[in-house]
Amino acid sequence: MIITFPGSPYKLNQAFQPAGDQPEAIRILVEGIESGLSFQTLLGVTGSGKTFTIANMIARLGRPAIIMAPNKTLAAQLYAEMREFFPENAVEYFVSYYDYYQPEAYVPSRDLFIEKDSSINEHIEQMRLSATKSLLEREDAIIVATVSCIYGIGDPVDYHGMILHVREHEKISQRDIIQRLTGMQYQRNEFEFARGTFRVRGDVLDVFPAENSETALRISLFDDEVESMTLFDPLTGQTRQKVSRYTVYPSSHYVTPRSTTLRAIETIKTELTGRLNYFHENHKLVEAQRLEQRTRFDLEMLNELGFCKGIENYSRHLSGRQPGDPPPTLIDYLPDNALMIIDESHVTVPQIGGMYKGDRSRKENLVAYGFRLPSALDNRPLRFEEFEKLMPQTIFVSATPADYEIQRSGQIAEQVVRPTGLVDPVIIIRPVTTQVDDLMSEVSLRAAQNERVLVTTLTKRMAEDLTDYFSDHGIRVRYLHSDIDTVERVEIIRDLRLGKFDVLVGINLLREGLDIPEVSLVGILDADKEGFLRSERSLIQTMGRAARHVNGTVILYADKITNSMRRAIDETERRRNKQKLFNQQNNITPRGVNKRIKDLIDGVYDSENAAEHRKVAQIQARYAAMDEAQLAKEIQRLEKSMLEAARNMEFEQAAQYRDEIKNLRSKLFIGIIDPDEIREVPQTAGKKSRRKAGR
């Protein structure tokens, strides 16, 4: 059911009315924003519907919003939920686009210089560009971001100044359009039409916008006049719609006008001269020679091409900032009336504070030893005090808010009662000595009931070793930690929900906000090891992962009860009692959370994977519709194909035909076709067969 509010551009897809503590929390937050409160906190337990409350608040206020999450996994989850709540509005995703990133560094003790190395995820880069476009164009924009949003991107003034507006019947030559596109870092490519490219065919110019993955623009010109414009499918060429005007945005956040680049070159030369004098005066000739060689090369590249490798280190010169000025970030693109929601604030706020110092310590070595100019220090994330000055009206969201949030907040809205009636999980304490074997027996019980299990360890090595041990004993298990890239993390969580495996082992990523309703057991190993991973807040957050299941249970493996454990257990018991009282007073029977399993991020599966799934679905449907006689004929056909493949020495393909025949024969024998067990037979040798989950 779509709901709208007076004066708000948002259309809220609301399947149910706010219940429990939600209506009061929504009222408090909305009134707080309207009365001008700078900071508020939503203290909501796991499973109480905090995201639904925030969505209602945004819809009622009708203002653009940025939602910050502590990691990419939670950002993807929030993005998926917000898209479901606001299917007709601009919900965007802004996280780091690096799948792999090795920053530039120098180790003086070993005289070792490490070059910058990175791998950029094209799809996430497109989503980042789409996010800034929505902020510039629309009032109904909701940006879901990580702490990546406090790192420098292009100056919004330069970015906005480079935008190309094209209108029907406008007087503009093809040469001028090409020149503008080239300045916006679009590349001419007549053979491969991809994002951020354009091609020219006679009087027709095709542009593939960098922020779009599905639609391209065709501009037809006649005698230096735009005759018509159409949006078309870049793959099939099919026309989608005619448009009278269109705005083409730069292909990168880091575009700069030619005049700005030339001005920056002069200021870089001035800084270089001063730095070389410093090195010579201090008899650091190696550093001077190194700096001059590297910087002169970069200046030549900037002059000839408009960019160079490591151009971000000259961002202060390109944006015209003074030394020490904060860099332009995504927050500078926010409208004046925007809202900021910091999810899991007890983790996200300290993250923001820690980014600057870590970046600074690495770059100081590069500057001191002549690898970079001192201005490279200004290519940095925001300092915490700079971030605070830029914060619009802000809502902190957490089940365990820290002292910072509580002290800054004008008011705190509590959301402790769950509309579903679910109570906090039962907590059991067991000894450390038998923790692995005890946990394995508990896992087997849960797997038999088609329930999932989360296990937290203290180190990556422990997580991997435990995964190997469980796997050797026939348990379907995977691990999740920081070495796994963004897209794979999302796939792992999705596969856990789908039941492709039963146990997920992790360290610090199995805490804040992870929404897996199928999880009925959380096992916390070495719970009595006092520290960051076993603090009161960490324990409450980890235990909360089992709070979305009717049979939610937490097992703490400990030989002693620490102060953190005691406080976490007491708080959980307090919340259990409050929920039980609410259930009794309102005659509510607890019911589990049922959430549709969907892709968290569009495009996380590659085209080959998607094609494979389509092919498998077709095979499943075909086999399911066959009678016994048709199945027998299909087996004969596959046998011929198997022998033919063997004669051609395509043994992998022959083995897969053999497996398929065996599978069909077993189904023919018992007279049942189970679509989940039909596997695709690849058409080319060397491709892996589609295995059953758990193999």
UniProtKB/Swiss-Prot annotation:
GO term, biological process aspect, one: SOS response
Main location: cytoplasm
Residue ranges annotated for the Helicase ATP-binding domain, each copy included: 31-414
Any one annotated GO CC term: cytoplasm
Residue ranges of the motif Beta-hairpin: 97-120
Domain UVR, residue spans: 632-667
Taxonomy, superkingdom: Bacteria
InterPro entries reported in the protein's UniProt record: Helicase/UvrB_N, Helicase_ATP-bd, Helicase_C-like, P-loop_NTPase, UVR_dom, UVR_dom_sf, UvrB, UvrB_inter
Cellular localization per UniProt: Cytoplasm
Boundaries of every Helicase C-terminal domain copy: 435-601
Residues involved in ATP binding: 44-51
GO molecular function, one term: ATP hydrolysis activity
SS bond partners: none
Written domain comment of the UniProt record: The beta-hairpin motif is involved in DNA binding.
Subunit structure comment from the entry: Forms a heterotetramer with UvrA during the search for lesions. Interacts with UvrC in an incision complex.
Recorded family membership: Belongs to the UvrB family.
Stated name of the protein: UvrABC system protein B
Taxonomic placement: Bacteria, Pseudomonadati, Pseudomonadota, Betaproteobacteria, Nitrosomonadales
